[in-house]
Design a protein with these regions (language model features):
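Short, acidic Ser/Thr/Gly-rich low-complexity loop/linker segments typical of extracellular
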Residues: 19-22, 29-49, 124-126, 130, ...
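Exposed aromatic-hydrophobic patches
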Residues: 44-49, 142-143, 179, 203-210, ...
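Short coil/turn motif common to extracellular beta-sandwich-like domains
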Residues: 2-8, 94-98, 136-138
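A short, solvent-exposed loop/turn motif at the edges and junctions
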Residues: 44, 48-73, 215-236
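Short, ordered, surface-exposed loop/turn motifs in non-cytosolic proteins
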Residues: 16-32, 98, 105-122, 212-213
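Extracellular beta-sheet/turn segments enriched in Thr/Pro/Gly and aliphatic residues
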Residues: 1-2, 72-95, 230-242
């Protein structure tokens, strides 16, 4: 009997519109070599029978910046949420609020750093229970808005020093299921902001696009808050120091 192990499932979305990107549009490299994951409806890419250990999946698509994600293959199936960011040839240039963020450390460019940017989405999503304890893998949530929250999707629980990044894998009624247990406790009414992962280039710069003027939280790899930015219409240029 032939057994196939699903090593990783990657869901790919357009980071500007939130729409699904079908796998047939993507060019994929795994650990530097071209690969062809199995594309499934709904923007899913399926990687099977990978050697145990760390891997890097790179994704390219016309109109978008190159994106990559690192994960470790093992006995369990890894669930990955990837957003492709608009590039120079992206079609909706006039509708964008642009951010160019320069990141420095010790006066030098902070190259190759992973940062999360989180901003309010079309739907307001908040914790709806008195307290969500650290170690809990589910949350009672309150959603308000015309559009359904992105599920599965990555979010920042905006909670000051207790802020953290989570992956919301399912939402049934008011109950949200998390990919991993909470690292920190959170109280009622803490907001869940849609979050996207970015990588600084060799000059310590990243570029992002948003649908409207907004407040953006800049976070480190684990969701620790580094800066808050207010974006206005048109081009926005900011510098932060780690």
């Amino acid at each position: 009997m032939i057994r196939i192990h699903v090593s990783a499932v990657c869901r790919v979305r357009d980071g500007f519109t939130g729409k699904i990107l079908e796998g047939s549009r993507l060019q994929c490299d795994l650990d530097g070599a071209r690969c062809r994951p199995t594309a499934k409806p709904g923007g899913y890419l399926v990687l099977t029978d990978l050697p145990a250990g760390p891997h890097r999946l790179s994704l390219r698509c016309p109109g978008y910046q190159e994106e990559w994600v690192e994960f470790s293959a093992g006995r369990d199936t890894q669930e990955l949420d990837v957003t492709m960011k608009p590039g120079r040839s992206y079609p909706l240039q006039r509708d964008m609020i642009r951010l160019t963020l320069k990141v420095t450390e010790g006066g030098a460019p902070a190259a190759g750093r992973i940062l999360w940017l989180a901003a309010p989405g079309q739907t307001e999503l908040k914790i709806a229970q008195t307290k969500a304890e650290a170690g809990s893998a589910s949350l009672r949530l309150f959603a308000k808005g015309a559009a359904a929250p992105a599920v599965p999707g990555t979010y920042l629980i905006a909670d000051g020093k207790n802020s953290e990044i989570i992956l919301l894998r399912a939402l049934e009624g008011e109950m949200g299921e998390l990919l991993a247990p909470l690292a920190r406790p959170h109280s009622r009414s803490r907001s869940l902001l849609p979050a996207q992962r970015y990588h600084t280039d060799g000059e310590g710069v990243l570029t992002a696009a948003f649908r409207e003027p907004c407040a953006v939280e800049v976070c480190g790899p684990e969701g620790e808050l580094l800066a808050g930015l207010e974006l206005t219409q048109g081009e926005n240029h900011h510098t932060i120091q780690l």
